[in-house]
Amino acid sequence: MSDAKAWAAADDAHRLIAKALAGLVAEDPTIPPHPYLSRHLADHAARGNVLDDAHVPLAVLPWESSKNVRTLLRQAGAGQHQDWLEAWAVIEPFVRDADPDSRLTSLHLAHHAATRRRTPLAGLPAARRGLAGSRITPLWSDWTVPGNVLAVSDILVESLAHTTTSDGRNLLISGDSHGTIRMWETHGVPFGVPLHTYGGAIQHLLPLQADLFVSGGTDGAVRVWDTLRGRLLAEPVRRPRTWVSGLTLHTPADAPQCILVAHSDGRLTALDTATFQPVDTPLPDLDAAPAILTGIGLAETDGMALAIAQGRQVCVWRPGQDVVRTEQHQDEVRAVVDLPVPGRYATCDDSGHIGFWDAATGRRTAAATPSPAGSVIALAALLVDGEQAVVSAGIDHTLRVWNADTGHPIGGALEGHTAPPLALTELPGDSQALVVSAGADKTLRRWKLAGHGSRPARVVRRPVTAAALPSWAIAAPSLLIAVADEAGTALWNAETGRHVRLPAGESTVTAFAWATVCGDPLLLTAHSDAGIRIWSLDAGNGGAPGSRGKLVNHSIPVQAMEAFTDGERTLLATGSGDGSVRLWDLGRQRQLARWDDHMLSVRDIAVLDTEDGALVVSAGADGTVRLWDPATGPSGRPPIHCGQQGVHTVATVPPRHGEAALIASGGEDGTVRLWDAATLRAAGDRFDAGDGPVTALVSFRTPAGRPCLAAAGPSGTIHVWDVTARTHLLRIVTGNPLSTLAIRRTSEPDAEHPVLLAAGTAGVCVFGVHLERY
């Protein structure tokens, strides 16, 4: 190792080392490998051009700690037999401090989703379904995820910039909503320690020469930082009760370069780039409103102009000349960016308009056609395949690329973010055009733009709007999966892989429920037109379900519903955005009751079985959980004020063997709280997911009868807790926001492992859960 000259080529040594180290990895992934293996095996394999599943075995991945497998895969390019490595790269940014069992389980699910999409159970031998140490058995999936996640942030990133240090290192800089600045290697690994301002959000970052950069935030302060040393050098400006609305460099034709700072009251301040002291230089008078700034490069001897946006108006100013105003935008301008062509710049606004302008005349030279849907939040200028281009970030979660000369789109939309991108920057140091975006989904994503206009758009899975599994009580011959997205609704048979489409029309399905009426299995679908449709399942011949009627009374779409038996009747409880809980007799297809006690929308519905009959439990956006008696209406019990900054979801834990019946609520604050159904008091400490709101929640029992809860939300992680022991059992990381959890509970006594469905922006997956090892 110390004398690389002894080898014919440097990669020969790494290839042999990787081969030798791979032989030291135990076949059982539950056995911890030597720390050197987990830290360096993937790197040796990459350097030796043998980065594949044989040289980096599956068993070492749950222990992998180099945190750069996804980067190594990008550098090494496509290889042979990298299925497990690629599956690990998808979830690697999200696993963080998960325990090895959770990592292995997450890897197992990710691998199945990537390699067995829509594969029927009959097509997968039982021997290949299991994996030693995994807590699940994947059964069926329709899951598509982008692989361009560069990094994941705990906090919302609101600003991005890039810089090249004096030693040639290319770095990304991000500023977040909590006032923290982080630096990243261009492959996503953090560089240095976070820098804390202990002030407002960092919304502007401006790299300078000599390894410095400037930040501006909502606390009204401008700060100067040393990039390599990671320390604060100066705070030349602080204006309380204002915020920094713009930062740019400005070089007049006959004066030294300076830093221009704009505050929310329209005041401009010029700072010397060496001393950071205020300098006396001519500046335009602005309205008392937030100003967005960018310096516009002119011809070599003409210095720079300044483009300034305030509200819907943009103007161009040069020292010694009058302000040149452009035509007024339709809506508030969100970003102004300088183009590499002298005297040219681009703007975008909340109407979705993107304009390209000439600074000398104030006239528009081109406009983006067609305009993207919704507001455009940020812009970045760069060369794409030799053409001057602008990348836009839209409220519709996409990035788009535009020719800066014609305004015409280059290629299709770039999809992958699950929330709007908030900031953009070009990524330096690569021969290809690259852009990094920071989204409200708390991910930094890397986009390769070379050849974008000539290659077909990547197929992106539409987010699932509803999904469900039938319970054991539904007379179905095999595992059925109901899935809906914007493209339509389908009923899949996981055993055969076949599916049928529901002729549900153009309205999107917002919720599912399963029921049995007079022995006939039914599927109920709630729609965006506020109606509920009833379908009879033709399980015998695999044909499309037939329509059995429609329930209409809600004024806003139903968000949750649950069917249950009450004596000889089959009832349906529904909760809607109109704030009401309604009760229906499915046999007669008529409404029995309407309860309007929730002040805001009803987000979830559950049913609690008690000795005295079933109770309907509803979770409201007003932060309460309420109980309803199907026979009498309100159960006579007061609402539960959950104190969770809003309740998104609710589940029930029926009593067994002398246990108390419990109600679980999932909140905006990221907690799950348990409530005694009899006393309506808190039952023990809350469970803390620790990674964002809990928006989906189910309860189930293991074959041994242990009550468990599974919770998920926008973080994309499924948390599993033991209710009795109050312990966290498992984290199943998917890397994409989840909106739905459903459970197929087994009959009494529990003789099988429960089956869990998870669905969200990337699709749907179904798996058996095995927790008895704990």
Annotate each PLM feature:
Residues 6-148:
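Hydrophobic repeat-domain scaffold segments
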Residues 150-158, 195-202, 237-244, 283-292, ...:
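WD40/WD-repeat beta-propeller blade N-cap
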Residues 160, 205, 247, 293-296, ...:
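Hydrophobic core register within WD40 beta-propeller blades
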Residues 163-168, 207-210, 250-256, 298-302, ...:
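Residue-level detector of Asp-centered blade-edge/turn motifs that repeat once per structural unit
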Residues 172-176, 213-217, 260-263, 306-310, ...:
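Conserved beta-strand element within WD40/beta-propeller blades
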Residues 178-181, 219-221, 265-266, 312-314, ...:
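Short coil/turn segments within WD40 beta-propeller repeats
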Residues 186-189, 227-230, 273-276, 318-321, ...:
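Short loop/turn segments that connect beta-strands within beta-propeller blades
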Residues 438, 442-452, 733, 738-774:
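Blade-level signature of beta-propeller repeat domains, shared across WD40, Kelch, NHL, RCC1
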